[in-house]
Every structure is written in structure tokens, then in C-alpha cells.
């Protein structure tokens, strides 16, 4: 064993004159992501959460996916913003667990 500049022991095979064991010539990084929601359909209109809600589908000439956003409650349930807004006009609770509704976040 040899000792490096900081006083740590290093194997003698890793001394400066030895050839490298391998060299990284190319590295392809891959990243994955996922939503923090279990169900990917809006429980109010039953459309996929990333598709237009039924209100936006009815007005498809003027609606875009940027206008049809997703809203999460503090209970972590997600709905189309238009759907949950319409629901909250009559009841101030989550449609799935009946807890008082508070927005956690909304957007894409």
C-alpha cells in the first residue's frame, strides 16, 4: 500500500504510472417522471386528466389545452379545474373523499 497526499492508503496498483482500468467514452442519461396521482381520470367528467374536460370539448373551437388545467386538492385528488370549480359552486368538499376542499395547486 502507498499513502496519498492526504495521508490515506491507496492500493499500489493505482499509482500514477499505471494504465486506467476503463474510460467512459459516452454516457446517455435517462430521466423518468410521473404524476403524484394514483387515478389519471377526472372523477367528475371521467375524461383523462391530461385531455380536455367536457366543458372545453364542447367549446373546442375556442378551447386549448393551456386553458384546461388540472387542480389538486390538499387531499391529493386531481380534477380538471373547470370540473372542480363547477362542483364547488354547490358543495365545498372533495367529490371523492368528502373532506373540505382546499386547493393545493393548479396548473399543468
UniProtKB/Swiss-Prot annotation:
It comes from the Eukaryota. Keywords: Cytoplasm, Developmental protein, Metal-binding, Nucleus, Ubl conjugation pathway, Zinc, Zinc-finger. A zinc finger (RING-type) spans 53-98. It is found in: Cytoplasm; Nucleus. Disruption phenotype: Severe pruning defect in ddaC neurons. Also shows defects in ddaD and ddaE neuron pruning and in ddaF apoptosis. RNAi-mediated knockdown results in apical detachment of scolopidial cells in Johnston's organ. Coiled coil: none annotated. The keyword Transport does not apply. Pathway: Protein modification; protein ubiquitination. Zn(2+) 2 binds at residues 53, 56, 68, 82. GO terms for cellular component: Cul2-RING ubiquitin ligase complex; Cul3-RING ubiquitin ligase complex; Cul4-RING E3 ubiquitin ligase complex; cullin-RING ubiquitin ligase complex; cytosol; nucleus; SCF ubiquitin ligase complex. The RING-type zinc finger domain is essential for ubiquitin ligase activity. It coordinates an additional third zinc ion. Belongs to the RING-box family. Core component of multiple SCF (SKP1-CUL1-F-box protein) E3 ubiquitin-protein ligase complexes which mediate the ubiquitination of proteins involved in cell cycle progression, signal transduction and transcription. Through the RING-type zinc finger, seems to recruit the E2 ubiquitination enzyme to the complex and brings it into close proximity to the substrate. Required for the specific SCF-dependent proteolysis of CI, but not that of ARM, suggesting that it also participates in the selection of substrates inside the SCF complex. This is RING-box protein 1A.
